[in-house]
């Protein structure tokens, strides 16, 4: 866990197995923060991920103001991500479930590897050995349920808020979704202004 007054990352903070937790007044990321486990950021004032990338098995962000302009906040796990903020600026940003890149074509699925006769073209001799590997725990990790809860405003201009899990977006004041995309199972809006173009 990192605890500081201000945290600024323009490089790489990553972990292959452990949770990354940062507690600060302000957190600024223009680099990469990644883990296969949980990424938990708690800022008393602001999380600024403009042009930055956050990628984790589960994402849990809490701040008064969250800015993700041209940034990416991607969750690779199937659990619900959790974002709590007073305001969210997601102009040209992406928030949600990480997707596979299909820009090289419209191929779907996987291609089976060719199957060959193991004795054909084998150069193996009778001096082989067998090593027993230690067992690996393959139990999937479970995380807390989450939601995206914004107390005031969302500015999702040309941005994307996507998630294929059963997650709710709750907004109390206004949504500005101009040229943006919001794909979530549920949207609860109790505010004054909803602009969707």
Tell me the role of every PLM-derived stretch.
Residues 1-5, 18-25, 37-44, 57-64, ...:
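Well-ordered beta-strand segments characteristic of repetitive beta-sheet solenoids
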């Amino acid at each position: 866990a990192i605890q500081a007054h201000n945290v600024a990352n323009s490089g790489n903070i990553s972990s292959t197995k452990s949770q990354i937790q940062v507690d600060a007044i302000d957190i600024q990321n223009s680099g990469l923060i990644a883990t296969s486990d949980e990424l938990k950021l708690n800022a008393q004032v602001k999380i600024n991920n403009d042009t930055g990338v956050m990628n984790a098995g589960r994402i849990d962000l809490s701040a008064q103001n969250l800015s993700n302009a041209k940034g990416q906040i991607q969750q690779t796990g199937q659990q619900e991500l959790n974002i709590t903020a007073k305001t969210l600026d997601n102009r040209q940003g992406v928030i949600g479930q990480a997707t596979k890149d299909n820009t090289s074509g419209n191929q779907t699925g996987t291609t089976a590897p060719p199957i060959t006769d193991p004795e054909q073209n084998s150069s193996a001799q009778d001096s082989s050995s067998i090593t027993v590997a230690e067992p690996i725990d393959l139990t999937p990790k479970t995380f807390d349920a989450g939601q995206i809860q914004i107390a005031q405003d969302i500015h999702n201009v040309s941005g994307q808020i996507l998630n294929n899990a059963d997650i709710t977006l709750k907004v109390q004041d206004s949504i500005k979704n101009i040229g943006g995309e919001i794909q979530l199972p549920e949207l609860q809006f109790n505010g004054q202004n909803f602009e969707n173009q």
